[in-house]
């Protein structure tokens, strides 16, 4: 083949004569100086045909797509190792992959199930919760839960103070969404002096840390005399909050003001001597204390005394 290629040199090839240093074009039709009998073409047409074949082969690209076997994969493996996969095998592989996906098989990757699970639980809690507005201030959470218990099992009831109205609103959560749907029929029911409105809730009830809940009958009685106040001016002191509620509602027996450097406002727990004072304090929602309108709602937790640590012996 090398001999044939040498014979079929293109007519435009330049051959150096080695003497003058000038390039002299030499036609391929001229015969080489030394030519064996085996390389001599039998006829000129046969020679021309051979030359065309050699020229054609020289233009071919062995790596072209049409000359690359379909069963050979483009991998980092060496060229002498070829993996042959039948079309049916490829189809079976796709079926196996889909089956693993359906079975939540995710080798080498972390499946974030806890986040998805918590989102699903939150959405389920929203479906089981209704929003109740225009609640009279004389209505307690126990009384409201008793009213809605006719629709299904009530698992949580939270009354909150509305800063824009003397009336309050609440969230009632049921054990299933059927109870929440049934509760919608209670819209317009008179509770106290006002008919309440009942709508599907757009939020779930924020859970309370169980360690903060009342642990005894005495602490439950304390909760009935305690309010939870938010949006308190950051510059307000405990004396400011105490003076505000004592002059407007009644005697304050205990107060806890909490805040940090991150949030722009603070929160407060205020315990009164009488439960009636705590009910009256709910009317203070929307009143400006310092430079912020406060929001007041019944407290779910009592104000516990701070634990004082005795100095360690030397």
From Swiss-Prot:
Tissues where the protein occurs: Expressed in cauline leaves, stems, rosette leaves, immature siliques and primary inflorescences but at a low level.
GO CC terms of this entry: nucleus
Keyword check for Coiled coil: no
Ranges of compositional bias, category Basic and acidic residues: 23-47
UniProt keyword terms in alphabetical order: Nucleus, Repeat, RNA-binding
Source domain of life: Eukaryota
Subunit composition and interactions: Interacts with MPC.
Record protein name field: Polyadenylate-binding protein-interacting protein 8
Lineage: Eukaryota, Viridiplantae, Streptophyta, Embryophyta, Tracheophyta
């Amino acid at each position: 083949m090398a001999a044939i290629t040498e014979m079929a040199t293109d007519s435009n090839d330049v051959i150096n004569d080695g003497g003058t240093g000038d390039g002299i074009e030499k036609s391929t039709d001229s015969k080489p100086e030394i030519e064996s009998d085996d390389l001599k073409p039998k006829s000129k047409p046969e020679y021309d045909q051979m030359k065309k074949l050699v020229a054609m082969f020289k233009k071919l690209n062995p790596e072209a797509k049409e000359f690359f076997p379909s069963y050979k994969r483009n991998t980092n493996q060496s060229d002498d190792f070829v993996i042959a996969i039948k079309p049916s095998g490829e189809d079976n592989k796709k079926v196996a992959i889909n089956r693993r996906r359906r079975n939540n098989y995710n080798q080498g990757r972390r499946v974030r199930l806890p986040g998805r699970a918590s989102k699903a639980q939150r959405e389920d809690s929203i479906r089981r919760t209704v929003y109740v507005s225009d609640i009279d201030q004389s209505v307690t959470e126990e009384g409201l839960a008793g009213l809605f218990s006719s629709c299904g099992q009530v698992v949580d009831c939270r009354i909150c103070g509305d800063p824009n109205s003397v009336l309050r609103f609440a969230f009632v959560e049921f054990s299933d969404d059927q109870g929440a749907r049934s509760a919608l029929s209670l819209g317009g029911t008179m509770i106290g002096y006002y008919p309440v409105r009942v709508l599907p809730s757009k939020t779930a009830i924020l859970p309370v840390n169980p360690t903060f809940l009342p642990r005894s009958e005495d602490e439950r009685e304390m909760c009935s005399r305690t309010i939870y106040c938010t949006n308190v001016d950051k510059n307000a002191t405990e004396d400011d909050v105490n003076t505000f509620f004592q002059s407007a509602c009644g005697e304050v027996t205990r107060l806890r003001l909490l805040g940090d450097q991150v949030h722009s406002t603070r929160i407060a727990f205020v315990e009164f001597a009488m439960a009636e004072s705590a009910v009256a304090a709910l009317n203070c929602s929307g009143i400006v204390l310092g430079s912020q309108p406060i929001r007041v709602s019944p407290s779910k937790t009592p104000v516990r005394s701070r634990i004082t640590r005795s100095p360690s012996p030397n």
